Amino acid sequence: MRKSSMWLITLLLLLSFVLVACGGTETTEPPAEQPVTTDEPIEEEATPEEMAEEATPEEMAEEATPEEMDEEGGAAEGDCASEEVLCVGLVTDVGRIDDRSFNQSAWDGVLRAQDELGAQVEFIETTEATDYQNNIALFAENGYDIIVTVGFALGEATIEAANQYPDIDFIGVDQFQGEAVANIAGLIFAEDRAGFMAGALAGMLTQSNTIAAVLGTDLVPPVVAFKEGYEAGAAHVNEDINIISTYHPGGLDVAFTDPEWGATTARQALDQGADVIFGAGGNTGNGALIEVASAEGAGESLYCIGVDTDQWETVPEAHPCLVSSAMKLITPGVFDLIQASQDGSLPSGNFVGEVGLAPFHDFEDQVPQEVKDTLVELDAGLRDGSIETGYNPGG
């Protein structure tokens, strides 16, 4: 897809030719950009949040847009005000779009909408929690049809924006909806079930009977659910298990973007005898996985388990130890809700996505068949309710 910034380059080139031909010396200020579309998760050019430092959403909406520069007068690519164009914007929580975990999984769902539905897409990376509302408004004021907000912490800002912009559909990833709002779908997951499966795998693979979990902050309910499920699953299959679970001590602004702390905490767990470590905390958890992968015995006597997505695909540095991942199927969940919005059937309230374990990949032959069979039985029990994780969100 062409980026909106190409219009600026083309305009400047045309102006330079005209000025040279006419012998003029004055220059013309180009119109300000609005959020641009992209094919790639990472942009080198100015981002919408950088633009926000210079103008409010309302000012950006009033300024000239790339569509207004279309010399043929038609709806140019990027014309989100056109009913013929589906525009989808994504706002991350504090952290990068390429976190190789939570944010990236949601963005992949948006990119799938670009490929399969012809949507024009863009993201904004949040750098400060105080920017939530303004980042959402950047998309809303520029005519975006669907806005995806990623993470529990954006829940309040998403509800406020949905009430302010009732004609825009919102998808709140990991945002439980206590009261349904007509234009919000909360994409939620049973993280305790995914954690239970990861814990059961760890409890059956361990030789030392000590396993660990390196986690994001307990201020985020899904992280707590992963941890509680992990511990319950391990205890379900191994009554002698010893579990070392550690939450990041920082707030939402740092708890998921601290791979150094993740690595240090994983090393401490290894030193205490843990031989299977679950990394569940965005890039912080990735640091734990990579630390285990670099340790002596990785893949033979030491294993690690990823989170949110199949991290075999996103964290290749963890391959030496990465036996599986506790997955929330965020990518298909986001895509399905975007498609529902396009069809005019976005479900209000909560939409429960699927969870499960990722494939074993290179460890397929190392995982005993008995372990695989037990995991199948546990998954079936969790689904039919005969097995419970014991996790109580209100408890």
What annotation goes with each model-predicted range?
Residues 1-9:
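Bacterial N-terminal signal peptides that target proteins for export
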Residues 18-21:
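C-terminal motif of bacterial Sec signal peptides marking the signal peptidase cleavage site
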Residues 23-25:
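Intrinsic disorder/low-complexity signal
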Residues 9-15:
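Hydrophobic helical h-region of N-terminal Sec-dependent signal peptides
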Residues 27-395:
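A residue-level marker of the well-folded mature domains of exported/periplasmic proteins
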